[in-house]
């Protein structure tokens, strides 16, 4: 239980000189003061956990190529820069490095592609038809489920059970809940006649993808019986390099994610514990 029984705790910055805060955190403090109404330079901030970053992403090879020929991924959408935790400024590194590698790889791929405009039009028309069929099916649904309620339920279960601290029994319960939500999703109703400018239809499409991805995250966590980076299991508090020094790969099958593993290359840099405690050694600081 947090402040006033809510999911909040205090973050006290009042001991830091206001000049220092303004220089280093000025924009953040202004936003906080605008929305909350308190000046964090003089009053402790009220904060709560939130998802700031998603570690992982599309699988790519060393040339930023996905498993789909011709589709490259660079920046925060690919997994390759991320480890078990996010390092500060990694977003910038992933964008710069990914773009540096992906651009020439894309040019090289394009040089060797047999150009056929007619074939491209056929593929486009085929995909357009498929997406329209999905939209039409959603629009015609007339069930009694509210997609926004499903979204809230999914968010609460994921926040409660699939953030940093994870227990296997709760992960199993969460996956069962996600399966329930996916079944209830079939009974949602768009309830919006203005389809030209509707936000309900795009949200419904996004929700379907979020439920799929939530299962990937939940089952991926369930499969990893160790603690590593931002993945902590009290039942398995130590890192297990013998069994889990590998990347989790999930493949879409239409009937739930299919998992495999890819070994992590540590020939140049060995994994080390990131230690924030007082009196840490110089090695731990690296």
Stretches found by the model and what they are:
Residues 1-55, 68, 75:
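C-terminal catalytic lobe of FAD-dependent flavoproteins
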Residues 2, 8, 53, 59-73, ...:
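Glycine- and aromatic-enriched mobile tails/lids
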